[in-house]
């Protein structure tokens, strides 16, 4: 379906001229994002087919230049903005329980190592995750993805790492795979088996690293 949104307060562009490949704008250069004011945007079946300012649109129409077939639906974008989708490349969107109490400890000066030594941190998250079913984890994660989407995120990476065992890491990755089926976001997964070392793992850090890399990883890919 051909659609057009008109009178946008702002249309943020990835690059000018738009024919160039998007580049990276680091640091203060991020203040120089090109923006079209009082703009329009055309799209059809999820693909952008045209954009520009309303004055450009009026000029083209008055001069008889065709912009393709007329839109089947015109939306009023007064006061609204259109931005390129955000890519959130580092998230832990799948988890079983928040750790806000640890945040209070950090504010009071506790180090992460001190929190972990008392049973908190990643090990606390791993225990909570092991106790929940995949269905529960999916049901709890979907609203988080919906909240991200409402604020402009269109692609998201989700890490495992709160499993710390083959079964739980596999469970987390299965949850991410299920989220891909139910969310319109572009969802990618990362195996983070070395997020922390379980205190009860026989052989300690060296043995855990060996297991996570050489035994678990081949069974998860």
Language-model features and meaning:
Residues 21-23, 58-75, 202-203, 209-210:
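Intrinsically disordered, low-complexity coil segments
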Residues 1-65:
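N-terminal metal-binding scaffold of metallo-dependent hydrolase/deaminase domains
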Residues 5-7, 13, 72-76, 189:
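Conserved beta-strand scaffold positions in the cores of enzyme catalytic domains, especially
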Residues 65-140:
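Metal-associated gating/positioning segment near the N- to mid-region
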Residues 125-140, 146, 154-221:
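Metal-coordinating catalytic core of metallo-dependent amide/deamination hydrolases
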Residues 41, 46, 79, 90, ...:
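Divalent metal-coordination and catalytic microenvironments
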């Amino acid at each position: 379906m051909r659609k057009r949104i008109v009178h946008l307060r702002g249309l943020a562009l990835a690059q000018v001229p738009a024919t160039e490949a998007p580049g990276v704008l680091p640091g203060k250069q991020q203040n120089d994002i090109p923006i079209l004011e009082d703009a329009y945007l055309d799209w059809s079946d999820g693909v952008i087919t045209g954009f520009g300012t309303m004055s450009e649109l009026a000029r083209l129409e008055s001069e008889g230049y065709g912009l393709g077939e007329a839109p089947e639906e015109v939306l009023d974008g007064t006061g609204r903005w259109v931005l390129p989708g955000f890519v959130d490349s580092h998230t832990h969107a799948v988890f079983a329980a928040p750790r806000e109490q640890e945040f209070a400890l950090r504010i009071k000066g506790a180090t992460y190592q001190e929190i972990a030594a008392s049973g908190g941190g990643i090990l606390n998250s791993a225990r909570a995750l092991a106790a929940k079913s995949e269905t529960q984890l999916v049901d709890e994660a979907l609203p988080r993805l919906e909240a991200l989407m409402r604020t402009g995120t269109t692609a998201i990476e989700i890490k495992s790492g709160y499993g710390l065992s083959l079964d739980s890491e596999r469970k987390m990755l299965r949850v991410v795979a299920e989220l891909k089926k139910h969310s319109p976001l572009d969802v990618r997964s990362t195996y983070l088996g070395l997020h922390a070392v379980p205190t009860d793992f026989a052989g300690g850090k060296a043995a855990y690293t060996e297991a996570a890399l050489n035994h678990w990883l081949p069974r998860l890919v």
